[in-house]
């Protein structure tokens, strides 16, 4: 059985972070659940960003503290995904984005990793004192909807996001 671990990113993963980022850029796939990684070529810059945001140090007013994890397959050290846990809400996050953002690298999709990473982050949500978390997905993302439902998501409605021109489905998961 594969051993998969949530880890906070650090510079020892620089090559893997670069590879992970590049795979998304090459595939034209959005890098969800990892903040500004798409815009940061230097992994050390991104790691510093994640540390600053977890501490809540010098973050923009329209942002909230968040904890960043990478999801690592221990057998080969490959980053399979990223997940970001937002400690609270801004008005935008409360309406559209939720507590959790995540993605699985394109070459590792459809293997159940998204379901597992969302499940594995729930104990950390509990440590933060979150009793329920809101997770959203674009209404056309069937795989993400299934991931959320498998983890106990309860549908709360669909909202139109005018800037991105998409409908977001909102779900709540009780943290046990």
Q: Across the structure, where does each feature detected by a protein language model lie?
A:
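Conserved catalytic-core motifs of GNAT/GCN5-like acyltransferases
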Residues: 136-137, 152-169
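GNAT-family acyltransferases
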Residues: 1-99, 164-176
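Conserved acetyl-CoA-binding loop-helix of GNAT-fold acetyltransferases
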Residues: 101-104, 110-123, 127, 146-150
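Conserved beta-strand-loop-alpha-helix junction that forms the acyl-donor binding cleft
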Residues: 135-145
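Charged catalytic carboxylate motif
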Residues: 16, 117, 143
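A short, internal acetyl-CoA/4′-phosphopantetheine-binding micro-motif in the GNAT/acyltransferase core
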Residues: 72, 86, 99-110, 138
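Catalytic cores of nucleotide-sugar-dependent glycosyltransferases that transfer UDP/GDP/TDP-activated
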Residues: 71, 122, 130, 158-161
